[in-house]
Amino acid sequence: MSEQIKKRTFKKFTYSGVALESLLDLKEEQLISLLRCRARRKLRRETPIKHVNFLKKCRASKAAVTQVGEKPALVKTHARNILIVPEMIGSVIGIYNGKVFNQVEVKPEMIGHYTGEFSLSYKSVNHGRPGIGATHSSRFIPLK
């Protein structure tokens, strides 16, 4: 019996049924029609100059890459409300969370999300043990 070796097939990324290569070629109006309602509304309204300049910096950093496989230079921003579009895929962005710039590499799955979603501005709470006076029964707990 000869065993046939099965090749692994990987699922190609699609956004709303459109392949990634096609997404990069779409015009702005066609892209807007694919996005969810909140993202459509944001892109239909006037885009702030700050966001346009950020996209220009992303384009420039991707164009400056000389070797294949090399990551583009970090592009920092304080704007947490920039919508991620297909043009930004592959860029490395630094999103300010109020303390530091968190480095994020933009992946296709991030399309339609805001930059702030990938840089949390708070630290999750790890509750310690309750102290004296936390509850009525804690009066009877010895101090140590």
UniProtKB/Swiss-Prot annotation:
Keyword entries, A-Z: Ribonucleoprotein, Ribosomal protein
Database matches in InterPro entries: Ribosomal_uS19 (IPR002222), Ribosomal_uS19_euk/arc (IPR005713), Ribosomal_uS19_SF (IPR023575)
Single annotated GO MF: structural constituent of ribosome
GO cellular component: cytosolic small ribosomal subunit
BP term (GO), one: ribosomal small subunit assembly
Listed Pfam families: Ribosomal_S19
Annotated family: Belongs to the universal ribosomal protein uS19 family.
Protein name as it appears in the record: Small ribosomal subunit protein uS19
Record lineage: Eukaryota, Amoebozoa, Evosea, Eumycetozoa, Dictyostelia
